[in-house]
Amino acid sequence: MCIGIPLRVLECAPGRALCGDENGVRWIDTRLVEPPAPGDWLLVFLDAAREILDAGRAARIREALRALQAVQAGDPAALAGLFADLDREPQLPPHLQAQLPPKEPT
């Protein structure tokens, strides 16, 4: 499985960007994406940017990665805040709801 890590751009140079998160700072190859700007978020795999992310998507990916760490650490209590919607019933998308038979009146 490949897991991309969201990193924030701190400084830019041709073909690379200095990026960081709570685990440190490192140079990332940016030749596969449009040139980023300081403050942008990059999805990084093997020290190469694969995608420029908006802040919301970067936050969701970071939360999912924290959830994986909590599971690996055996801390199920930490999952409640990371997956607050687990107690709701899943909803089918509209195109699949349209294929369901009509509900019988009760």
Swiss-Prot record:
SUPFAM superfamilies: HupF/HypC-like. Signal peptide: none annotated. Transmembrane segments: none annotated. InterPro entries: Hydgase_assmbl_chp_CS (IPR019812), Hydrogenase_HupF/HypC (IPR001109). GO terms for molecular function: carbon dioxide binding; iron ion binding. GO terms for biological process: protein maturation. Belongs to the HupF/HypC family. PANTHER family: HYDROGENASE MATURATION FACTOR HYBG, HYDROGENASE MATURATION FACTOR HYPC. This is Hydrogenase expression/formation protein HoxL. The lineage of its organism: Bacteria, Pseudomonadati, Pseudomonadota, Gammaproteobacteria, Pseudomonadales.
